Amino acid sequence: MLELPDPSRVDAAAGQQDRQAELRKMENIPARYRNHPRFEELTNDPAHQGDKPGKVLREAMSALEAEMSGKVKAPVSRGDTSWIDFYDGEGYPFDVKTPLSPTVGDKWEFNAYGVADTILNQLHKTHPNKFTHEKQPVAVLLDTTYMKPEDLLALRHELRKKTKENRSILKRVFEVNVQLDPPALDNEKPKANKLSVQQQALLLRQRTGR
């Protein structure tokens, strides 16, 4: 069986939940992805019959960023069934999840329990490898761009709670943040999202497995 690379974890969710709604049409997609020679191909989703809704565009961004940052094996290609979103360069099946945190003024709260369930539901599925046609456990690419840092910590906590008997399943979760803005110069870099002392302690426990 082909093996996946070691799972990737982001330092913190990007906290850009207020910008997800901007990414609904091709012209709204950052040039980093829109101008890539395979971006158009990655937006050809069999589940949407040629339509390109914002969800499909964002999934293509996630997959391409995972490839360009070396988090999955290149080249990625769009899934050819409605059950997965893309394959990595060795044909391994991936599903993309792009959870959304509430923005200022929203009257709903992030449901870490529910999002964890949707991720685990995919992790318990199998799908044929694109090249070998051997059934393989589905991996999940978790795009944390549109999440608050504290919501990602809560989601990780729920995933660990729900997998006490089989933590190894979480090795098939790969985290990524897409780049919605061009890289800033050193003297123009925005301040990173700061975590509270409690959040930092929880993150440390998650990283050390304690």
PLM regions with names:
Residues 4-209:
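Catalytic toxin/effector domains delivered as secreted proteins or via bacterial secretion systems
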